[in-house]
Amino acid sequence: MKHKIIWNAIERLAKDNNLPCSGLAKLSGLDATTFNKSKQFFADGTPRWPSCSTISKIIAATNISIEHFAEICAQEKQKLSIENTIGQ
């Protein structure tokens, strides 16, 4: 699993629910800035991964299963693979 895939899946889940990422965060009981691009990496450039608790909250808030979230991740992985192939 790649960092970018998880974050893309979260952004996709927000979009699929007609929400900005801040709206998904609020719906999930999280701070509105939780999914800001600026929070996807630490100051030193190290990737910041969303916690299991955060993922659990967005799954519950959007009423999907963990399997559905995994499917979204798989679709985002495929998109990323295609983008990388085209970019070569």
Where are these regions (language model features)?
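Recognition helix of helix-turn-helix/homeodomain-like DNA-binding domains
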Residues: 29-48
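Short coil turns linking two alpha-helices in DNA-binding domains
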Residues: 20, 31-34, 51, 65
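Short, basic-rich loop-to-helix N-cap that marks the start of a DNA-contacting helix
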Residues: 43-60
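Residues in the recognition helix of alpha-helical DNA-binding motifs
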Residues: 13, 27, 37-38, 72
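Short, charged recognition helix plus adjacent turn
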Residues: 60, 67-88
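A short, Lys/Arg-rich alpha-helix, primarily the initiator
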Residues: 1-26
